[in-house]
Amino acid sequence: MNLPIEQYADLLAEKAKNLTALLAPFNPPELEVFESETGHFRMRAEFRVWHDTNEVGENELYHIMFDQETKQRYCVEQFPIANHLINKMMSSLLAEIKGNELLTRKLFQVDYLSTLSGEIAVSMLYHKKLNEEWQAEAAALKARLEHQGFKVQIIGRATKQKIALDRDYVEEVLPVDGRNLIYRQVENSFTQPNAKMNIKMLEWARSCTRHSSGDLLELYCGNGNFSIALAENFRKVLATEISKSSVQSAQYNIEQNGIDNLQIIRMSAEEFTQAMNGVREFNRLKGIDLKAYDCNTIFVDPPRAGLDQDTLNMVQAYERILYISCNPYTLAENLRQLSLTHRIERAALFDQFPYTHHVESGVWLIRK
């Protein structure tokens, strides 16, 4: 698999041109463009596993992917968009499990989650129930990989079953504006795939909100990626998240980073909108006085569908809106309404996904 590195600048320029055109009706300032590294930038990778027999009758294993157009499978020995740690682990893992019936039988997928801090989680997915014998072999595998110098976690998954030998997460350390921020990242949960671009996003968001007054509300906070980085720019931060594992990670990350002004609530953005509007009462909000928060800034990082109408109406009531988008088309759709009351103070393109059409962007909106 070869990357068209020589085309990177032109591909990024095309993304910037298209995003500029989408935002043009809303009179934004000049687009800030943050370029990615051209290779080994991705911290996660997932591969199907192909089982074959060589000419002398030995079982062979391969990482494979599928061509998006032809749907044909192809073998992946090295994966140049993934960071060096994943590439090193890919070859080491297959070499270590080759010929081991307990570890390879009905293994159909391997997921890798790595960090800039040097940790990696390897999740092995099976079409069979995992027993104590598998666990013993997996523990021996972990020890052999650690002997090679890997800081590795091994997780086995099957239908309605998950076995983490030690833990099911890695700990990332991101240098943001001169401070190291610690983030627990759980396997099979959402994390930003391009860690160095994530740092640029966090620093951009911090620079937008640097002289803010009052409190911050964040919807869809995940493991606290943004809210932890932004907390020192505000008096208090209130954040919502629906995923139980993400909330648990966020609580851990808050403690590890010494944040004392950030409260996480486990509820959806839609539910929080109902609570704010007094439509419903929620037991999860007992002990939390929403009236004690003076949230005049709101941060949203919605899914590809953008903000639903009720949330959009709620967001529009805030003086300042920081909107991170993974879909520029739904961002532009949402801006049709938001631009009636707010102006774009800053706009940015973050090239999270080089060599693809995907565009991550951000706008900083101030009430007119």
Curated annotation (Swiss-Prot):
GO biological process: tRNA methylation
Entry EC number(s): 2.1.1.-, 2.1.1.35
Name this polypeptide is given: tRNA/tmRNA (uracil-C(5))-methyltransferase
Coiled coil: none
Catalytic site positions: 326 (nucleophile), 360 (proton acceptor)
UniProt keyword annotation of Heme present: no
Assigned GO CC terms: cytosol
